[in-house]
């Protein structure tokens, strides 16, 4: 069995996406005024993998010319770097954008890691992280592609949550640990 590190140290910039979204910097609430900047951070924080610029452009501005959308992304990244407590939280090059994995963490990335564990303690921790529907209450008006991504991702996490609950229930039953 693979054991999961339970004394996981949260990075200084933490993004909660399961349930009502929330961002903290050094355990203090942090807000970004622009909804589109929050949408960008939420998308990047989902799995903490670099996202191709082309996909982000299509996600945030599907109905405008590509050159205009590229300029919009450049401006949005500039705004985000200025608004974030440290500009190095956001990494980008000519092809992709990412959050700095050394400084940024998310409940969804931790949830996925724990769901893949092979022990009941990891599964219990995963269940405790699931505080509700992915990005519950968050929308990005005027971006049907973001809405589509959001609904697909919500279903993905709901399925993962139900699967980890089944694994945990089976493990508890096998150990005779049930009410």
Residue map of PLM features:
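Intrinsically disordered, low-complexity protein-interaction/activation regions
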Residues: 1-179
